């Protein structure tokens, strides 16, 4: 199982740790999508920026 993560809000005025988390996920701009492995590390990062991203589960990698 994998997660498709899309950035839906920008980082202006956000805390540094939230900006760093988006970068770690591979997101740089609004509308960008990445696919990441569904594990506890990724889930924790998504939780940190849950108000800035949209997440859906997809089959495969």
From Swiss-Prot:
Q: Name the UniProt key words of this record, in alphabetical order.
A: Ribonucleoprotein, Ribosomal protein
Pfam families xrefs: Ribosomal_L30
Give each disulfide bond as a residue pair.
none
Q: Which InterPro entries match?
A: Ribo_uL30_ferredoxin-like_sf (IPR036919), Ribosomal_uL30_bac-type (IPR005996), Ribosomal_uL30_CS (IPR018038), Ribosomal_uL30_ferredoxin-like (IPR016082)
Checking CDD domains in the record gives:
Ribosomal_L30
Keyword Ribonucleoprotein listed? The answer is yes
Provide the Gene Ontology terms for cellular component.
cytosolic large ribosomal subunit
List this protein's GO terms for biological process. translation
- Gene Ontology MF: a single term: structural constituent of ribosome
Self-association state and partner proteins as the record states: Part of the 50S ribosomal subunit.
HAMAP family referenced in this protein's UniProt entry, alphabetically? Ribosomal_uL30_B (MF_01371_B)
Q: Which family does it belong to?
A: Belongs to the universal ribosomal protein uL30 family.
Matches recorded under PANTHER family: LARGE RIBOSOMAL SUBUNIT PROTEIN UL30M, MITOCHONDRIAL RIBOSOMAL PROTEIN L30
UniProt-recorded name of the protein = Large ribosomal subunit protein uL30
Q: Which species does the entry assign this protein to?
A: Corynebacterium urealyticum (strain ATCC 43042 / DSM 7109)
**Gene that this sequence comes from:** rpmD
